[in-house]
Every structure is written in structure tokens, then in C-alpha cells.
Regions:
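Protease-domain processing segments flanking chymotrypsin-fold serine proteases, especially trypsin-like
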Residues: 1-66, 74-75, 79-84, 100-102, ...
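C-terminal subregion of chymotrypsin/trypsin-like serine protease catalytic domains
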Residues: 23, 39, 53-54, 58-72, ...
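Acidic glycine-/aspartate-rich tracts in secreted/extracellular proteins
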Residues: 44-46, 70-74, 85-90, 135-139, ...
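Active-site-proximal beta-strands of protease catalytic cores
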Residues: 64-69, 154-168, 211, 230-251, ...
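Extracellular Ig-like/FN3 beta-sandwich strand-entry sites
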Residues: 77, 154, 349-353
Length: 376
């Protein structure tokens, strides 16, 4: 379910929240007036959106975007940028906004896959929704209304995303993801059919399933997570799903299988509520000082306007390397205090970074220092 590599694994991309998938066999959206409310979430906040955009979302109010909770899990809200109506990621970034706060839906949890319970990339999820509050309203793009009742089995829905294509090409090849916004057409399934096709662990209350059963079926792949699914009601689109997980939970990543969408309709009142339980928001990144043969990490202060104080804070260290323009963090074993011997940091490739995680009832964030060269 992760955008680049497993968050829980030995190597994690700074840009990766929890899970993130993308579309196979979708069709390009040619009409510039269609789906202008699609959001693209860039947790890195720097560089080409084609390279660093990781998840989708939907503008449901002038100042708020709905996405998947796993897209913002363990991400630094202070670095994140949200792009509305980015039609072509490489050259049309759309309307850009910063983040003034994030709230994860209470009860959000990952559900281990029966295929491999220890592989977090195969997890399904429950209550996989989050709201991103924008630093400034978006007033020139119509919002996407949230539906009022879950579509019945057999209802057609359309899914809009910029995810990976599933083609067997390298990360550096532009064919690996959909630069242009794509659409996939699915049909809503019953819960029983979804469980039969995916896993016994599908939460009916918070997950709606759909599948494309055509001869050339559209399916999810990496970087589609959080992207919106809509149905037409009285001639207008309404949000009925937020992409959460797909065939990867049964070992069919980027392949034809039922698709699990978090149900925003079930939590409509929460989405448009006061959202007081904001996740922690670092006022700045941690800072690393080099003193003799050791490194010391100064923890960040916390912005109490854009977030609530954390209930727990932990410190770790990692070596940072790069996959293209995406940073990859390899944790340094046993490094769980603010001080680190340089000799320990120099055992693996890459510069050393301090990683601070903080959590409260609104969610979990992770903020990372600038790198320090430990191999000179």
C-alpha cells in the first residue's frame, strides 16, 4: 500500500505515507473542464510534481481536501503541498496550496493481508480517510459535492488519478506513471463479492468496493491512493469513494481485482465538521549539530495554531540516499536517542538525518532534518 517502498520496511521514502496505488488501463481525460476538483498531494513539496506527487484527493470545500489517511500518515505537514486541477503533472501543476492542518479519521487502522501479514505494503485499511485543511481557500475551482448515500451494487462509478501505469519500465522512464489525468470506469460490488475477491478483512462500514470487468480492465497501481471515485446524480458528479487498496492485498498488485474505496459518505458529517483534533505540526524541521565524534538532534518546537501538541514524541536516525528526486531513508539500528556516534552513522551509505515522529489523536507525523555528511 506504499507509494515507493514499505514504510514499515528497512527502506522508506520520505515522501511515502502509508499506502499509495495508481491506475492501469485508464483513459486520458481530454476535457479540461472535467474533474477540475482532483487534488495531487506532494509530501516533498519541492521539485517536479511528476516526480514527487504521491497521492490524489478531492477538493470538497474551498479550504479542504479529502484523501486517504495512509497518504498523510507519517508525513510532515509543513513540507506538504497540495495541487488542485493539475492536468499534466510535468508542466501544469494547477493551483498550489500549503497546509494549515491535517486530521485523520478516528479509527483509521491497517488490516494485515492473509497473503503475508508481515508485509505492510499488502495491508488493507479501515476508516482510511483524512482531511487536509488548506492554508488559503481555492475560490476559482468548483468543489466536488460528497454524496448522501452509498451507491448500490451495480452502479457505475468513475475514478480519476495520476498513478503508475504498471508498465515494466524503470523509475526514470516517463512511461512509468500517468502524466496526464486518467479515468477508470468501475461498477460497485456487493460486500460479499468484494470479500470473495480480495480478503476476509474488508470493513463493510468504511469500505465500498468496485471492479472493472471489461476485456481490458482498469485497475489500481502505485500512486493512485486517495484519488476520488464519483457517480453521476442528477447530471452532476458526487464523491462516493476515496481509493484505499486493491489487488495488492491478495498478491495482484496493479492487476485486475476488486478495488477498495474508503467511503466518505459514511463520514460526511465528520468531513465538514470543526475538525479540532489536528495532528501535530512542527514549526520547523529538527536540526542536527556535529560535536566532535557525535551528532546531536535538536527536536522541533510545535505550531499550536496549525496543530495540537503531540502526546508522544520519538527520535530516530537514518541514512539518506536518493531514488531520482525522492529521498530514501534507511534506519540506523538502535539509534533511538537525540545523540548518535558518527561511527554508527557511517556504517551505511548516505548522509545522516534525524527523524522525529510525533502523534496525537489527530494523526502521526514524521519530520526529518537536513542531511549531514558522515563519510568525509
Amino acid at each position: 500500500m506504499c507509494a515507493a517502498t514499505g514504510v514499515a520496511g528497512a527502506v522508506a521514502a520520505l515522501s511515502c505515507g502509508g499506502t499509495a496505488q495508481a491506475m492501469v488501463n485508464g483513459v486520458p481525460v481530454a476535457d479540461a473542464e472535467t474533474a477540475k476538483w482532483v487534488a495531487t498531494i506532494d509530501p516533498v513539496g519541492d521539485g517536479s510534481l511528476f516526480d514527487t506527487g504521491q497521492c490524489g484527493g478531492a477538493l470538497v470545500g474551498p479550504d479542504r481536501v479529502v484523501t486517504a489517511a495512509h497518504c498523510v500518515d507519517s508525513v510532515d505537514p509543513g513540507r506538504m503541498k497540495v495541487h488542485i486541477n493539475a492536468r499534466v503533472l510535468s508542466r501544469d501543476p494547477g493551483v498550489e496550496r500549503g497546509v494549515r492542518g491535517i486530521v485523520v479519521l478516528p479509527g483509521y487502522a491497517l488490516e494485515p493481508s492473509a497473503v503475508d501479514p508481515d508485509d505492510a505494503d499488502l495491508d488493507s485499511a479501515r476508516n482510511d480517510l483524512a482531511v487536509i485543511l488548506l492554508d488559503r481557500p481555492v475560490t476559482d475551482i468548483p468543489v466536488l459535492p460528497v454524496g448522501v448515500s452509498r451507491p448500490a451494487p451495480g452502479t457505475p462509478i468513475s475514478f480519476f488519478a495520476h498513478g503508475n501505469t504498471g508498465k515494466a519500465v524503470g523509475f526514470e522512464d516517463p512511461e512509468y506513471r500517468n502524466d496526464v489525468l486518467h479515468r477508470g470506469d468501475f461498477t460497485v460490488m456487493s460486500h460479499a463479492d468484494c470479500v470473495a475477491g480480495l480478503s476476509p478483512v474488508v470493513d463493510d462500514r468504511s469500505v465500498m468496493c468496485a471492479q472493472d470487468r471489461s476485456e481490458r480492465p482498469a485497475a489500481s497501481c502505485f500512486r493512485d491512493s486517495g484519488s476520488p471515485a464519483v457517480t453521476e446524480v442528477d447530471g452532476r458528479p458526487e464523491l462516493v469513494g476515496v481509493f484505499s487498496f486493491g489487488g495488492e492485498v491478495v498478491g495482484k498488485g496493479c492487476g485486475p481485482a476488486p478495488q477498495g474505496f474508503a467511503d466518505p459518505i459514511a463520514f460526511r458529517d465528520w468531513i465538514f465538521g470543526p475538525l479540532d483534533e489536528l495532528e501535530p505540526y512542527p514549526a520547523a524541521a529538527p536540526v542536527v549539530h556535529r560535536t566532535g565524534e557525535s551528532l546531536h538532534c535538536d527536536l522541533p518546537h510545535w505550531d499550536e495554531v496549525r496543530g495540537r501538541l503531540p502526546g508522544t514524541v520519538s527520535v530516530g536516525w537514518a541514512n539518506r540516499t536518493w531514488m531520482g528526486k525522492l529521498p530514501l531513508l534507511t534506519p540506523i539500528a538502535g539509534a533511538d536517542t537525540a545523540d548518535l556516534p558518527i561511527a554508527d552513522a557511517a556504517r551505511q551509505p548516505g548522509d545522516a538525518v534525524c527523524v522525529v515522529s510525533a502523534a496525537n489523536s489527530g494523526g502521526v507525523i514524521r519530520t526529518v532534518s537536513e542531511g549531514v555528511d558522515v563519510h568525509d
